[in-house]
């Protein structure tokens, strides 16, 4: 690691926070697990060298997934920590040496598959399934009982041989077959595909409808047992779990020596491609439970366990063509069209090439036999070329000088090539899709498939056109039925009240992501102030450097961008300003939402409450100011009634949000 400045540190924190948001909240990762782990290690090293730089929001301060805010939070019976990762046999040897030094002798180990899924804790009372929790922060997790109960391989009742009360811990996952079925369904409905089985499983566990979760064919593999009836070894515990009806994946094995562990690691790596589910490594645990107790744990990890992670899977195939796509900011991105190949449980036919420089650096040519890997991304990447198979007639590939969509000349920037034609339909379609997406305005029923159809028939050609759509317009579109029309119009109406940071994200300002948009909203408070901000004002904000500041000034200096915002406002879009504490009528008041809202989505309601200074909690307590009860409200409503709390319906919430006053 070379010389690092505090700005570099802040930039790395910001980048990892965004990766966390995309991974845990959106289930749309844009980076492989390995790349993420390497960046996290770099951040940890910087914080060791410069503890004075450490910020309270650093990703190193958190463990596990962030609460979704949709489920009650419940304490774990004992800490549910993550397992530290190693990527080489040398690092594994260091774990062995460290363990043996702490114990004073060489223990036996057990070894099991590291399924790439979501960790859960499942409690049984009187041998009946009682509750399921996510890992959360390791101390508390979200109550996901309803969704976990849909797992068909999970026993609802345990046999008499099992203890009356116990807890198992395991990994919820989707098999490759179930994952392919789910993504096929997503494609048919015009929705985003899941990046990998793990993110599909995570998204399913966060669904509010257990009926919908049941359709997705989740599975569970148990990796731990907690009971008062102490057993001698971890391996014996897994055998008991299997006898009681739990699925325990992948032939756990006891190993008496380091060499046996290494041999088993290699055996599993060879059979990895034939497994029916995704694994990203193996977990090695000290087998004797008493030895585990002696070794204990750190604030984040168990000292008695380590995860050996394999390199991403790789396949060889033919690069048949390179096509160029136009992104939402006009950047031209080359994409490899591949001869279809099976990789990590799915059929792969495309790979990301990023930019011209990347192609030149790797000397990638059409017709090459290439090696592809699939990490956390939906689209895999080319990691190498089999030069022995290259044709003597192959030629270097060059980025086109004209936009492939509008055929206007493109501009070469430092790294990127950009179409600067503001009327280019290619970039505009991408921009509108992003504007309506979950990452931006989150307009339900307006996925990529619907946007493309509306764009192709000429009903929308800009983001503001979304808010001008009428029932008569949509009736002209083939395939649109009355119910889908009403659902879409209701979602668009709900999106007209938008938090400032959400709109700034949705505008696709080059180099401004969600974290940058939040920083702008927090600093300036109103859209007008952001639009009129000077370069110096922008650069005074932490996390906004010269490049980003210049991009913001350039964006708002363009007439067409200001005109687009003005038209949105004319069509009824209200940008919710970030209010100061003195101006915030809901400041310090805690709200809980339960049931289904009709006039706005839960996300929109939460954002509007927060924009007025309020807080949104996932659980009801004496400190709750009011519970917002939609249709089909459940246990939270009953608890609020028992505590004598104020209960609002959606109409009252809307009135107060519109009036910006609780009086």
Swiss-Prot record:
Its cofactor is Mg(2+); Mn(2+). GO terms for biological process: DNA repair; DNA replication. It catalyses: NAD(+) + (deoxyribonucleotide)n-3'-hydroxyl + 5'-phospho-(deoxyribonucleotide)m = (deoxyribonucleotide)n+m + AMP + beta-nicotinamide D-nucleotide. Zn(2+) binds at residues 403, 406, 419, 424. Keywords: DNA damage, DNA repair, DNA replication, Ligase, Magnesium, Manganese, Metal-binding, NAD, Zinc. Its EC number is 6.5.1.2. Belongs to the NAD-dependent DNA ligase family. LigA subfamily. This is DNA ligase. It comes from Chlamydia trachomatis serovar L2 (strain ATCC VR-902B / DSM 19102 / 434/Bu). The lineage of its organism: Bacteria, Pseudomonadati, Chlamydiota, Chlamydiia, Chlamydiales. The gene is ligA.
């Amino acid at each position: 690691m070379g010389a690092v400045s505090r700005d570099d540190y802040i930039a790395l924190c910001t980048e990892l926070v965004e990766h966390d948001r995309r991974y845990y909240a959106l289930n749309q990762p844009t980076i492989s697990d390995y790349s993420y782990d390497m960046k996290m290690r770099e951040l940890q090293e910087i914080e060791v060298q410069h503890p004075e730089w450490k910020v309270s929001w650093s990703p190193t301060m958190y463990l596990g997934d962030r609460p979704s805010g949709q489920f009650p939070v419940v304490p774990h019976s004992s800490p549910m920590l993550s397992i530290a990762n190693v990527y080489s046999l040398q690092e594994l040897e260091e774990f062995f040496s460290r363990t043996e030094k702490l114990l004073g002798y060489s223990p036996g180990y057990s070894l099991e598959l590291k399924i790439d899924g979501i960790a859960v804790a499942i409690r049984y009372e009187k041998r009946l399934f009682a509750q399921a929790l996510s890992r959360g922060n390791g101390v508390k997790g979200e109550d996901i009982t309803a969704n976990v109960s849909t797992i068909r391989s999970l026993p609802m009742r345990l046999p008499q041989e099992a203890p009356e009360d116990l807890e198992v811990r395991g990994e919820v996952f989707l098999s490759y077959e179930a994952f392919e079925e789910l993504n096929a369904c997503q494609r048919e409905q015009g929705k985003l595909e899941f990046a990998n089985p793990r993110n599909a499983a995570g998204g399913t566990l966060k669904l509010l409808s257990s009926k919908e979760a049941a359709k997705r064919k989740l599975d569970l593999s148990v990796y731990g047992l907690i009971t008062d009836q102490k057993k001698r070894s971890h391996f014996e515990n897994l055998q008991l779990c299997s006898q009681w009806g739990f699925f325990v994946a992948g032939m756990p094995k006891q190993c008496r020596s380091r060499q046996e562990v290494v041999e088993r690691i290699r055996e599993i790596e060879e059979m990895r491609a034939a497994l029916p589910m995704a694994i990203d490594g193996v977990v090695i645990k000290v087998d004797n439970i008493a030895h585990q107790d002696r070794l204990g744990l750190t604030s984040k990890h168990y000292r008695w366990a380590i995860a050996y992670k394999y390199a991403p899977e790789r396949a060889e195939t033919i690069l048949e063509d390179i096509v160029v796509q136009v992104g939402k900011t006009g950047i031209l991105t080359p994409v490899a069209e591949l001869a279809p190949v099976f990789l990590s449980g799915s059929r792969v036919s495309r790979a990301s090439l990023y930019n011209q420089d990347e192609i030149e650096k790797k000397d990638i040519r059409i017709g090459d036999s290439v090696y592809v890997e699939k990490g956390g991304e939906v689209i895999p990447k080319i990691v190498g070329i089999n030069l022995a198979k290259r044709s003597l007639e192959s030629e270097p590939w060059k980025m086109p000088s004209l936009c492939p969509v509008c055929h206007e000349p493109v501009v070469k920037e430092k790294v990127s090539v950009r179409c600067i034609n503001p009327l280019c339909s290619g970039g505009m379609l991408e921009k509108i899709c992003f504007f309506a997406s979950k990452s931006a305005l989150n307009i339900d029923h307006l996925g990529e498939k619907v946007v493309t159809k509306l764009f192709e028939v000429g009903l929308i050609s800009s983001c503001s056109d979304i808010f001008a759509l009428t029932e008569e317009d949509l009736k002209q579109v083939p395939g649109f039925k009355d119910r889908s029309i009403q659902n879409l119009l209701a979602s668009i109406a709900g999106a007209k009240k938008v938090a400032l940071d959400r709109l700034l994200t949705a505008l696709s300002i080059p180099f401004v992501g969600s974290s940058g948009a939040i920083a702008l909203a927090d600093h300036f408070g109103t859209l007008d102030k952001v639009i009129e901000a000077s370069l110096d004002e922008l650069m005074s904000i932490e996390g906004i450097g010269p490049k980003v500041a210049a991009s913001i000034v350039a964006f708002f200096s363009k007439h067409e961008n200001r005109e687009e915002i003005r038209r949105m406002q004319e069509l009824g879009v209200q940008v919710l300003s970030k209010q100061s504490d003195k101006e915030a009528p809901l400041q310090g008041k805690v709200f809980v939402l339960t049931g289904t809202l009709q006039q706005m989505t839960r996300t929109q309601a939460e954002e509007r409450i927060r924009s007025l200074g309020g807080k949104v909690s996932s659980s009801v307590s004496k400190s709750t100011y009011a519970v917002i009860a939609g249709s089909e409200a459940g246990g939270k409503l009953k608890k609020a009634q028992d505590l004598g709390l104020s209960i609002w319906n959606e109409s009252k919430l809307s009135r107060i949000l519109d009036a910006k006053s609780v009086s």
